[in-house]
């Protein structure tokens, strides 16, 4: 019921659309933001780099440095190695969450945290809200590493083609904190045009709160290779993506992939936040678009 267009658009997102309509009068997208938005609308995915997207701030490099510090912690390496042993033995998930938040302790974020500063920046939120045409809620964040798998391993969990169940339209922002320049590094892969209103939207559709996992080989039989996009890039590559579209994570067979991810949904989503905002009294200093993004978690 929540995902029916009249309910989703006119009822559940009425307030967030009105707030955005008033706020966007003051928004001026840079040429890079405008290009990202255009690609996101056309294909459901847009790729840029922090050096051009955050050309006037250090937010991109701050989160890369913070990710590197976490990865260099001996406890992180111990956690990844333990997960690799478990996965090879029991076929558990192929991702290790280094900030918590997935069956673990929720990440505790405050305004000085580089992960939150990045996520709530006007650079990010202005693009996300422009695509969604409404204020959005910041629901989930994760810094995660893939584990190394033997070549030829069978796809499991997020390595399989799927559509996220969380909303009929949503945005995930991915930041590569390591080089992902070949298939062995586990590139993110997306079917261009599988987002809402896209040309491949009706192929293996999701009906929130239920996603979709196509049968093995099903996507390849229907979708031409030109529309199955692998996102390669150096450290600092930034991906905006509507993950209600068909997508999958990659196999890391030669090198682990370190990536930060942030999820933004509409007010229709029943997805609970996976982080804790530790200084809610400080939220008053944020712009309206950022206050709204964390308002469900204050």
Predicted regions and their residues:
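Non-heme Fe(II)/2-oxoglutarate
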Residues: 15-18, 22-26, 68-69, 200-205, ...
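A short secondary-structure junction signal
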Residues: 139-140, 150, 154-159, 171-172, ...
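Double-stranded beta-helix
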Residues: 181-246
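Histidine-centered catalytic micro-motifs
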Residues: 158-165, 246-249
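Active-site region of the double-stranded beta-helix
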Residues: 134-137, 162-166, 177-186, 191-195
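Extracellular structured ligand-interaction cores
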Residues: 158, 168-172, 185, 228-230, ...
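Short, conserved beta-strand element in jelly-roll/cupin
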Residues: 166-182, 232-233, 240, 263-266
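Non-heme Fe(II)-dependent double-stranded beta-helix
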Residues: 2-43, 49-159
